[in-house]
From Swiss-Prot:
CDD domains, per database record: Prefoldin_beta_GimC (cd23162)
Protein name (record): Prefoldin subunit beta
Cystines in this chain: none
Keywords, alphabetical: Chaperone, Cytoplasm
GO (cellular component) term, any one: prefoldin complex
Entry's localization field: Cytoplasm
């Protein structure tokens, strides 16, 4: 790294930072996708039950009785919230990928030996 100009060293530091941010965003996105899949499966299952079915939900460490309508409404709200979060994470991931691509090109350009003209 001694022969690398300070400007390029700074860009490399920024590149590493973007890579770490991207890794976190991807992990969060995977977690949200998993939660969304589980919530949709639960909603499908509950909607297939008769209207007078007894439904339970977990609240912290407790399991409490609720109505089918309440459970459906809560799951739909949760799904909507997760979809909004997932869209935000996808936008963030796209922006970070664009920044990484741009910065990588800048670094490569800065490290390229000047051509004799």
């Amino acid at each position: 790294m001694q022969n690398i100009p300070p400007q390029v060293q700074a860009m490399l530091g920024q590149l590493e930072s973007y890579q770490q941010q991207l890794q976190l965003v991807v992990q969060q996105k995977q977690k949200v996708q998993l939660e969304l899949t589980e919530a949709k499966k639960a909603l499908d299952e509950i909607e297939s039950l008769p209207d007078d079915a007894v439904v339970y939900k977990t609240v912290g460490t407790l399991i409490v009785k609720t109505t089918k309508d309440k459970a459906v409404a809560e799951l739909k709200e949760k799904i909507e919230t997760l979809e909004v979060r997932l869209n935000a994470l996808e936008r963030q991931e796209k922006k970070l990928n664009e920044k990484l691509k741009e910065l990588t090109a800048q670094i490569q350009s800065a490290l390229r030996p000047p051509t004799a003209g």
